[in-house]
């Protein structure tokens, strides 16, 4: 069984995000060993300067690197990442397993994204969409796509 870690900056606060995440975590338990790690989000002022943004990226990046599991595949969610279909995500996850990478870690940055240093650690950069979404919603979207990917691999009727 694959081990999947979702390493994310920021804590879910809104009930609808918490409920959605809990539902997908429950569904995913049959397909993988899932661990969600929430890291503190660096507090930024309302209109941060480029230096303040850089400081936040560095602080959040250090926290990510500290908690990053050793070995396995690393996937960074970022706007410049590769767009892919649900079927392709399913294939990529299976390919990681064939390569002996039974641990897959997905990285979700905070409101200012991921530092370039963190992105360089990734085996694959994935974009959920060319549109911009709140990072909390990106977590829900990722969890749904992980569930869908495992259902595709299992040949169930969930994915149409």
Question: Where is each model-derived feature located?
Answer:
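N-terminal beta1-alpha1 ligand-phosphate binding loop
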Residues: 1-28
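Short, well-ordered alpha-helix to beta-strand connector turns
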Residues: 32, 71-72, 122
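General small-molecule cofactor/ligand-binding pocket signal
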Residues: 7, 35-37
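Loop/turn-to-beta-strand initiation segments
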Residues: 3, 102-107
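Short glycine-rich anion-binding loops that position phosphate/pyrophosphate groups of nucleotides
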Residues: 12, 79-82, 110-113
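S-adenosyl-L-methionine/SAH cofactor-binding core of RNA-modifying enzymes
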Residues: 40-104
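Structured adenosyl-cofactor binding patch, chiefly the S-adenosyl-L-methionine
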Residues: 112, 116-160
């Amino acid at each position: 069984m694959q081990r999947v870690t979702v390493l994310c900056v920021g804590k879910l606060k809104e009930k609808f995000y918490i409920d959605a995440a809990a539902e997908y975590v429950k569904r995913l338990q049959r397909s993988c060993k899932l661990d969600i790690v929430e890291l503190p989000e660096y507090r930024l002022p309302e209109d941060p300067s480029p230096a303040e943004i850089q400081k936040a990226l560095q602080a959040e990046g250090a926290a990510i690197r500290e908690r990053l599991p050793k070995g396995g595949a690393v996937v960074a969610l970022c706007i410049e990442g590769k767009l892919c279909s649900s079927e392709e995500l399913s294939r990529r996850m299976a390919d990681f397993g064939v390569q002996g990478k039974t641990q897959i870690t997905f990285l979700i940055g905070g409101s200012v994204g991921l530092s370039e240093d963190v992105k360089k650690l990734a085996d694959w950069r994935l974009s959920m969409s060319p549109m911009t979404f709140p990072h909390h919603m990106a977590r829900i979207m990722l969890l749904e796509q992980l569930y869908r990917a495992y259902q595709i691999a299992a040949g169930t009727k969930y994915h149409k």
